Amino acid sequence: MLNDLYEEIKLRKTQPREGSYTNYLFDKGLDKILKKVGEEATEVVIAAKNDNQELIAEVSDLAYHLLVLLAEKNIPLVAIQTELQKREGKLSTTRDRKEINDL
C-alpha cells in the first residue's frame, strides 16, 4: 500500500493534476511540506492521548505527508526500507539512548 501511494505521489510530481492536494504541496515547496509534516506529527501525539480511530487517521495523514517529503527530496522509499533493515535485530539498551530531557 505505501509503495503504491508513494508511486502515485511521484506521478503527481511529474504529471500534475489540477486541484490535487499533492500538487498544491509540491507547488508550495519544501517549507510548506515541512510545516505539514510538523503539524501532522503534533496531531499524532495529541490523538494518541485520545481516541484510537483518531490516532489511526492522524498516523495516516503523517505517513502521507512523509511520503510527499521523500518525493520532494527525491529519496526512494527503498532507501527507508534499507535503513530499517540495517537496524533490524540490533541490540539497543536504554543507556545507549539520550534521555528525552537531554535532547
Swiss-Prot record:
Keyword terms, alphabetized: Amino-acid biosynthesis, ATP-binding, Cytoplasm, Histidine biosynthesis, Hydrolase, Nucleotide-binding
Keyword Amino-acid biosynthesis in record: yes
Top-rank taxon: Bacteria
EC number from the UniProt entry: 3.6.1.31
Molecular function per GO: ATP binding; phosphoribosyl-ATP diphosphatase activity
PANTHER family: HISTIDINE BIOSYNTHESIS BIFUNCTIONAL PROTEIN, HISTIDINE BIOSYNTHESIS BIFUNCTIONAL PROTEIN HISIE
Name under which the protein is recorded: Phosphoribosyl-ATP pyrophosphatase
Lineage start: Bacteria, Bacillati, Bacillota, Bacilli, Bacillales
Primary gene name: hisE
